[in-house]
Amino acid sequence: MSFATDHATRWVGLLNSDTAAAVDMYADDLVYDDHADSDHVVDTAITKAELEPRLAPFANNDSGNGVGIHNFTATEAFELAGIHGNPAVVILWDWTGEGMATYHGVPVDGRTLNTRGITWHQLDSDGKIARETTYWNDTPVLQELRIPILTPEYWVEGFNPSTLVGT
């Protein structure tokens, strides 16, 4: 395995199972941004104490508490040139959530949710995650929950933007 694949496999494994060990992968001086379809300000953690509650739901193993059982799978990982000679890793991942009561406040009604995302890690000189930026593709999840989000295919020949205008 490559360095990037090893890092990604360890990271998703700990996200799925051990919050304390996952938090330990991060540097004390950190910036964690988890972007979905919400304001980034509420999603930015700069201390391990702020990070821990953001990661904790992913390691939940109680199928009856409404938090859900989450599973991340790293599908691809690439090492990139980082800053100050330290590596960066970009991770493409799949996520499944089962047994969740709500997703961003929307009732899940027993559905198993799935999406994909991408995470970038800038590592420090000790190999700890100093900066993380994560992007979730929330659109298919919210559509699965019957939220009316349009995803027009603008690139298709003959697309008519007037079809998006309400009558």
Label each residue range with its predicted role.
Residues 1-167:
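C-terminal and inter-domain tail/linker signature
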